[in-house]
Amino acid sequence: AAGECINKDRKYFTGSANQEGLLSSGAFGSPQIMLRSGIGPSEEILKHDIEHTHDLPGVGKNLQDHIDYLTVHRYNSIELIGISLKSIFFKFPFEVLKYVFAKVGIFTSTVAEAGAFIKSKESKDIPDIQLHFIPTMVVDHGRTTLWGHGLGCHMCLLRPKSRGEVTLKSSDPFEDPNIDPKFLSHPDDMQDMIAGYKKMMMIMNKDSFSKYTVNHTMRPIDINDDSDIEQAIREEADTVYHPVGTCKMGNDEMAVVDNKLKVHGIDGLRVVDASIMPTLIGGNTNAPTIMIGEKASEMIMNDWI
């Protein structure tokens, strides 16, 4: 790797490294930069009239992400976090004072107040579903504001078998890549999501919750009808922003980096981000990604200091 071309305010600068370059743009950005640099599968690069400099068929492949389904229930009390006339005039002023003087109350909430790792089926060796309980009504990642009060529960598939990809739209470095997670393309993922949904609803329908619930804010779903559950999941499930795997570590033909994060066949280039994970972990990706950076710094210092 010779260096990098940097654009700032539409002006181009070229930088070079004395020892090696580190690529750390995430599971979407790292393969995008490599493909636009001519590193990756030849058919993907050449069709955009980019010079093909090194063949690595795994660049941009093996995309994995956690798919998540959210159930939301309206609540008949202002006890929980929400927006209403009662809460605006009678609750929020007191909550502000509680936070200012005692650091307690709803403004100390993490929103994800409780969680659980469960098995979608008893035959599973380890948990494959993660639940997040939230004491408020949030849909569409908070982009849509719901009036009133309620509670919700996220159901996340931890170990999906579906694999997606990141490809180029064009040779334009300012154009976003094509990102296709191919959620639920493996049939086992849907079956696990259906089983996980049923277990989640068993919890949400317990008396401790149901006696306060006014109605389900999403469309009604027949818990005994797998096809109804499947349709809801296909239409409403979404990402929780844990993409990995598009520059995976390994020694097989689809691997992009070795066990020192060095790009196969390219001198002086490492990838240091979540894209190097061969397989998505069964939990949040933040801490493991920090670990990757820490481990990479240790290996780099051992090589050069």
What are these regions (language model features)?
Residues 95-288, 296-305:
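FAD-dependent oxidoreductase catalytic-site/capping-region signature
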Residues 1-4, 150:
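Short, hydrophobic/aromatic-rich segments at coil-to-beta transitions
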Residues 3-100, 106, 171:
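Glycine-rich loop(s) and the adjacent beta-strand/alpha-helix scaffold that form part
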